[in-house]
Amino acid sequence: MHDSTAAPERVRTRFRERARQFDDLYEDERWLVRTLRPGLFRRRRLAVDTVAGYDQPRVLDVGCGSGRIGEFVLEAGAAHYVGVDFSEPMIDLARARLERFSERMELLVDDFLSARLDGPFEVILAVGLFDYLPEPHRFSRRMFELCAPAGCVVGSFPTWSWLKGPVRKVRYEWIGNCPIFNYSRRELELMFGASGFEPVQVLNPGRSGYLLRAYRP
């Protein structure tokens, strides 16, 4: 499916060195920015709406970054929020941003696949995560293990297009030395279905890629 043996360390290096730049992507919410980067705001809206649909859910945010989405889901009613990211600079930013929620949140610098996490969680967020994973099926399987019955995974996934694909390839892989992976609708249905999720809802709101809700029976 995806192949890049050096991918994890290359991704880790990029997010350690450019934590502030990634955080700034969410800073500007002017109309022009929303028009040029609609995917950032659509996936945040899906995460918030999903959390709001549960009664005080426990939320796990995999690849939580600087806590931008965490702030919104805590405001939306998450009873407890756990953010995990392997970039210490990102977690430092998240800790500062979410300080006012200190009694309801926990932040970990760790590898999701091996981290000790106290589940289950009603909502698991994987927003802006699968873009960088050479072995995504390992993540979907662990998410199933940590997901509560009737719980939900919310994810975002880039897809190849001739409009944005070449630009992202140059920006991330050639200039930034950071791998980037794309997905098809069928690939997502098979991966999450094989992990045990049912139903798997794949939404295609625009050119920026797919949004997903996958439920644990």
Sequence positions of predicted segments:
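A short glycine-rich, Lys/Arg-flanked "PGG" loop and its adjoining helix->strand segment in the class I
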Residues: H137-P149
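Conserved class I S-adenosyl-L-methionine
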Residues: M1-A52
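Short alpha-helix
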Residues: P179-S195
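Short, glycine-/aromatic-enriched active-site segment of Class I SAM-dependent methyltransferases
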Residues: T159-P179
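Class I SAM-dependent methyltransferase SAM/SAH-binding core
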Residues: S66-L113
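Conserved beta-strand signature within the Rossmann-like core of class I S-adenosyl-L-methionine
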Residues: A150-F157
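A conserved beta-strand element that flanks and buttresses the S-adenosyl-L-methionine
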Residues: L125
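Short catalytic micro-motifs in class I SAM-dependent methyltransferases
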Residues: G128-L129
